[in-house]
Design a protein with these regions (language model features):
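C-terminal motif of bacterial Sec signal peptides marking the signal peptidase cleavage site
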Residues: 15-18
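Bacterial N-terminal signal peptides that target proteins for export
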Residues: 1-8
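Ubiquitin-like/PB1-type beta-grasp interaction modules and other compact soluble beta-rich domains
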Residues: 20-206
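Flanking scaffold residues of small Cys/His-coordinated metal-binding clusters
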Residues: 11
Length: 206
């Protein structure tokens, strides 16, 4: 019986390793596997830590840029939660949101790659090669695009680049896959001046 139990444990370990390309909330941090719209995360500090990122009481602007994430469920745009990687104004990850527009703030003390996997781990959302939240293949197709070009690697590995538009599409796609984003249309409470659009890798509208 003990040998059989050991064999089962080993098999489960190997199976988990084979299911790469996914985020993990940790054993005490369950991931949201429900339908959209998805809420703000709980246990914010713990989820920042699970993403392998530091937290601080202030925002660091040594490295400062922005990306934009759209999520479409059967052609409908769904909001990105407004407090990912952030707890009020008292706790910040270098990777966070301030509104539901999909604008992703990268404000870090030093250069590093920030990925979609980190974002979804902070959010507490399931993301694998086949599933996002409560939607999974083969029932629902899951694809991603970066600046309008289909991304063929695991979605979790997408690096959030300066000014980039990332679209994650679940089920039937929207009429148009966005290849860019409008800075002025995505101004949120953390943006005080439209001239900051230049900081996002975009031209300031005339």
């Amino acid at each position: 019986m003990r040998l059989r139990s050991s064999f089962i444990a080993l098999a489960l370990t190997l199976l988990a390793a084979a299911c790469g390309g996914s985020n993990s909330g940790g054993s005490d941090l369950p991931l949201n596997t429900g339908p959209a719209p998805w809420p703000n995360p709980d246990k914010v500090a713990d989820r920042i830590d699970a993403a392998g990122l530091p937290s601080s009481s202030t925002e660091s602007l040594t490295v400062h840029y922005h990306s934009h994430v759209d999520i479409f469920v059967n052609g409908k745009s769904e909001p990105v939660a407004s407090s990912i990687g952030r707890e009020d104004q008292s706790l910040f990850s270098p990777l966070h949101t301030h509104a539901t527009s999909g604008l992703i703030h990268i404000e870090a003390p030093e250069e590093q790659d920030f990925t979609v996997e980190m974002l979804f781990t902070e959010w507490g959302m399931r993301l694998t090669n086949d599933c996002i939240g409560g939607y999974c293949s083969p029932d629902t197709d899951l694809t991603a695009y970066v600046d309008g070009t289909r991304y063929t690697q695991p979605i979790s590995t997408i690096v959030l680049g300066k000014g980039e538009e990332i679209a994650i599409v679940i089920g039937s796609p929207p009429a148009t896959i966005p290849s860019s984003w409008d800075c002025l249309a995505n101004i949120d409470p953390a943006i005080e001046n439209p001239a900051q659009c230049a900081d996002f890798g975009q031209q300031v509208p005339a």
